[in-house]
Amino acid sequence: MGKEKTHINIVVIGHVDSGKSTTTGHLIYKCGGIDKRTIEKFEKEAAEMGKGSFKYAWVLDKLKAERERGITIDISLWKFETTKYYITIIDAPGHRDFIKNMITGTSQADCAVLIVAAGVGEFEAGISKNGQTREHALLAYTLGVKQLIVGVNKMDSTEPAYSEKRYDEIVKEVSAYIKKIGYNPATVPFVPISGWHGDNMLEPSPNMPWFKGWKVERKEGNASGVSLLEALDTILPPTRPTDKPLRLPLQDVYKIGGIGTVPVGRVETGILRPGMVVTFAPVNITTEVKSVEMHHEALSEALPGDNVGFNVKNVSVKDIRRGNVCGDSKSDPPQEAAQFTSQVIILNHPGQISAGYSPVIDCHTAHIACKFAELKEKIDRRSGKKLEDNPKSLKSGDAAIVEMVPGKPMCVESFSQYPPLGRFAVRDMRQTVAVGVIKNVEKKSGGAGKVTKSAQKAQKAGK
């Protein structure tokens, strides 16, 4: 078998009709985890419904519908393989909660694939002021997705078909735009494709002999290729933050007969080991970890990305809850945040937002109302330069530095230190009205918290 391939997470972004579903469906279909039987079933259904032309998108729609109905579908359906990687599509927009998911990120994307449509008038609609192309690309960059691939899709519907001139025009415009956001176009592969016909998806297209391939230049090494699949192979694999102190936001806490209290969550940074003395914030409880397990198997250590359950001694289910954060009591233990300074971008709010606004913030697994206590400055959302001090109010499209105060005890961190605990979505009126990254956190000096007997024992034993 050889060594298992590295796992990479991608997020697919772009305007609503750019062909994201068809392109993604095509990759999953040709390289993915969908078995022949399922594909034949989908094809038959698509044909019966007169949707033969949508078969790739249809695959994705079926998966999406199942995902939205809450049927936990086999996640392998969202995976496909390249020569180097196992790639998981962690989200595709069009999904209602796409923006929220991207931020509270069940997992952080290693790379964003931006699909733009080359068809007459389509590209213009997508990149216009109110098109989603800009918003998605800006979001991806703000939330720390620093690698980008651009697929110029629907090359079969340019005038004339497969037009080199049209492709060059789009590359020029998208390059200028992503550069404004912060991406360096020299490091971004641009690939002309047809997600429907399959041009340049997996192998070079005979329809575009003028396309000599894409090239990227970067300090980690240059790369070149022709197809979209090859471009995915140039993604730089993430370095997992094992060297940082432990941060594990709790998703749930269970009481299991004969075992006791078992918090469950995903290790975001650092390493969790049995025997470790951990502190939970903001509740300020310190105790010993008895055992750690994943998929019902005991682990000697859990690493970033692992979803684990762990058994803690002398702590009741009433003491800790979803949204609490677990960390190593001896290495930068997590603490309650008294207040924090954030850079926020207002996405869609019908009115004006002024100081005193108290929406719900979704940050890691916490879901807590926070007050915009002070609007410190309005900034240019691309360059970050200050436009105005103490603005009276903010509206859609504005970016600002805001002082925020949690309405209930909460543990968050700065984005620079612990990215997954430093980005958040602002929810109001059942939608995401803003996104933010945390610049710095003023910690509450908690005084002495509760230290359980088992923690004292473990500390005495000098663990």
UniProtKB/Swiss-Prot annotation:
Q: Where is this region: G3?
A: 91-94
What catalytic reaction does the record list?
A: GTP + H2O = GDP + phosphate + H(+)
Instruction: Report if keyword Protein biosynthesis is assigned.
Output: yes
Predominant localisation class: endoplasmic reticulum
Domain tr-type G positions? 5-242
Protein modification: Trimethylated at Lys-165 by EEF1AKMT3. Mono-, di-, and trimethylated at Lys-36 by EEF1AKMT4; trimethylated form is predominant. Methylation by EEF1AKMT4 contributes to the fine-tuning of translation rates for a subset of tRNAs. Trimethylated at the N-terminus by METTL13. Mono- and dimethylated at Lys-55 by METTL13; dimethylated form is predominant.
Q: Which residues carry this modification: N6-acetyllysine?
A: K179, K439
One Pfam match: GTP_EFTU
Q: Report residue spans for region: G1.
A: 14-21
Which residues carry the post-translational modification N,N,N-trimethylglycine, per the record?
G2
- Which positions bind GTP? D17, S18, G19, K20, S21, T22, N153, K154, D156, S194, G195, W196
Q: How is its activity regulated?
A: Inhibited by narciclasine.
* Gene Ontology biological-process entries: positive regulation of apoptotic process; positive regulation of lipid kinase activity; regulation of chaperone-mediated autophagy; translation; translational elongation
* G4: region residues: 153-156
Q: Which GO terms describe its molecular function?
A: GTP binding; GTPase activity; protein kinase binding; translation elongation factor activity; translation factor activity, RNA binding
Which positions bear 5-glutamyl glycerylphosphorylethanolamine? E301, E374
Any idea which residues bear N6,N6,N6-trimethyllysine here? K36, K55, K79, K165
Q: Where in the sequence is the signal peptide annotated? A: none
Sequence positions bearing N6,N6-dimethyllysine: K36, K55, K165
What HAMAP family does the annotation carry? EF_Tu_A
| Membership in a protein family | Belongs to the TRAFAC class translation factor GTPase superfamily. Classic translation factor GTPase family. EF-Tu/EF-1A subfamily.
Give the record's subunit note.
Answer: Homodimer; arranged in a 'head to tail' dimer configuration.
Disease field reads:
Developmental and epileptic encephalopathy 33: A form of epileptic encephalopathy, a heterogeneous group of severe early-onset epilepsies characterized by refractory seizures, neurodevelopmental impairment, and poor prognosis. Development is normal prior to seizure onset, after which cognitive and motor delays become apparent. Intellectual developmental disorder, autosomal dominant 38: A disorder characterized by significantly below average general intellectual functioning associated with impairments in adaptive behavior and manifested during the developmental period. MRD38 common features are severe intellectual disability, autistic behavior, absent speech, neonatal hypotonia, epilepsy and progressive microcephaly.
Q: State the protein's name.
A: Elongation factor 1-alpha 2
